[in-house]
Amino acid sequence: MITVYGYVPAWGIPDISPYVTKVVNYLSFTGIEFEYKTQDLATLDQDSPHGKLPYIVDSDGTKVGDSNTIIEYLKNKFGDKLDADLSKQQLAQALAFHRLIEEHLYWSGIIQARWQDDAGWETYIPFIVQGAEVTPEMRVGLDAFRARILDGFNGQGMGRRSEEVVAEFFRADIDALSDFLDDKPFILGDKVHSIDASLYSTLRHIADQPQQWLGSGYVQTKPNLVDYLERIRKQYDI
């Protein structure tokens, strides 16, 4: 049994972290038996291999952190259940989209909305604290956590741009994904692959998060992306 540790579910999504959600998606797509547990954030640094979420604990006690490393571990242990049919060209396409999704779209579509925007941040806090009352001491810790995330946002470069420019980048990425998906059921064809675990997670987070910003609602203007989300939701009940 694989145990996945995350933050907390929200908005009908398995977890508020797109990377935790990606791991849950991969496990659901492959049919690997797993359970999800909410991590005690007070002991995260001690419990997680990298002090971050997600991480998994295997039945033999093995701990693995980082969503990409987790998926590679699962492939090595259980076999490559999703990608064995892909050609080298398709694997290259998957890698390129992986970079677009997790190193570009993640920042514009999620970090901008939840962490950079002040109103979005205030909307996000109740989900982070799981509905608990925010004490002054908790607020200090939350704001410090936000500052750390925004340091990464600025270091990536996206955070140094105006919301208008970030929204332009965001819409261009969504356009590219919609154009490539076209009328295919899944991003690389007729069945799900590992890249769909990441794409489905990120698009769900963008489409379903309550934070409002200049990119809000844009995913919903793409009928094929809306159909893609609904197709996976129905097929895998996630």
Swiss-Prot record:
Activity is inhibited by 1,2-epoxyhexane. SUPFAM superfamilies: GST C-terminal domain-like, Thioredoxin-like. Homodimer. It catalyses: 2-glutathionyl-2-methylbut-3-en-1-ol = (3R)-3,4-epoxy-3-methylbut-1-ene + glutathione. The lineage of its organism: Bacteria, Bacillati, Actinomycetota, Actinomycetes, Mycobacteriales. The gene is isoI. Residues 7-82 form the GST N-terminal domain. The keyword Lyase applies. It comes from Rhodococcus sp. (strain AD45). InterPro entries: FAX/IsoI-like (IPR026928), Glutathione-S-Trfase_C_sf (IPR036282), Glutathione_S-Trfase_N (IPR004045), Metaxin_GST (IPR033468), Mito_Protein_Transport_Metaxin (IPR050931), Thioredoxin-like_fold (IPR012336), Thioredoxin-like_sf (IPR036249). The keyword Hydrolase does not apply. Involved in isoprene degradation. Catalyzes the glutathione-dependent ring opening of various epoxides. The highest conversion rate is observed with the physiological substrate, 3,4-epoxy-3-methyl-1-butene, which is the primary oxidation product of isoprene. It can also use other epoxides, including epoxyethane, epoxypropane, epithiopropane, epichlorohydrin, epifluorohydrin, epibromohydrin, 1,2-epoxybutane, 1,2-epoxyhexane, cis-2,3-epoxybutane, cis-1,2-dichloroepoxyethane and trans-1,2-dichloroepoxyethane. Pfam families: GST_C_6 (PF17171), GST_N_4 (PF17172). This is Isoprene-epoxide--glutathione S-transferase. GO terms for cellular component: cytoplasm.
